[in-house]
Amino acid sequence: MKGLGETIKSLRLEKGLTQPQLAKLVGVSNGMISIWENNINEPKASYLKALATALDVSVSVLLGEEA
């Protein structure tokens, strides 16, 4: 089972997005995307929704609750 950071990175790469591109879509810094992808910290609930929207998946998919 993938962790949240690995899921974010995998989905980002599948969409062909760079960290700066995803950061702009979500409204955070480039560094924050790196922090999340490396499991240093997890995004707040409000950013989970923005990530899900940017990556075109549900929050449940991000959290590994559904495939």
Per-region residue spans from a language model:
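DNA major-groove recognition helix of helix-turn-helix/homeodomain DNA-binding modules
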Residues: K44-V61
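Residue-level signal for the short linker/turn that defines the boundary of a DNA-recognition helix
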Residues: E6, G16-L17, P43-S46
